[in-house]
UniProtKB/Swiss-Prot annotation:
Gene assigned in the entry: rpsJ
Natural source organism: Borrelia recurrentis (strain A1)
Protein name: Small ribosomal subunit protein uS10
Organismal lineage: Bacteria, Pseudomonadati, Spirochaetota, Spirochaetia, Spirochaetales
A cellular-component GO term for this protein: ribosome
Gene Ontology biological process terms from the UniProt entry: translation
Quaternary structure (record): Part of the 30S ribosomal subunit.
Keywords: Ribonucleoprotein, Ribosomal protein
Length: 103
């Protein structure tokens, strides 16, 4: 059964290496089923910065900054089959990678 839609897979992670490994495993699974694919497309990295005081009591000028970087990738799968969807659902991805699938 072939649908005429496309599936958009978005991957989020704090670690770039495991994000790229996950994207490559999805691309390999799609290429095995001989379906067209676009991506992985790197999306802008979201940087969240936190500034805290170093001292609990005095020294207001002494501060420390921390940041969290959220890396994103986008993969479009054109005309997916039901067998491809089953293989994507069974795919083992490393911990720390969030997957968002939309039609």
């Amino acid at each position: 059964m072939i649908t005429k839609d496309k599936i958009r897979v978005r991957l989020f992670s704090f670690d770039v290496k495991i994000l790229d490994q996950s994207a490559e495993s999805i691309v390999r699974a799609v290429q095995k089923s001989k379906t067209q694919i676009k991506g992985p497309i790197p999306l802008p990295t979201k940087i969240k910065k936190y500034t805290v005081l170093r001292s609990p009591h005095v020294n207001k000028k002494s501060r420390e900054q921390f940041e969290m970087r959220t890396h994103k990738r986008l993969i479009d799968i054109l005309e997916p089959t039901s067998a491809l969807m089953d293989s994507l659902m069974k795919l083992e991805l490393p911990a720390g990678v969030e997957v968002d699938i939309k039609q």
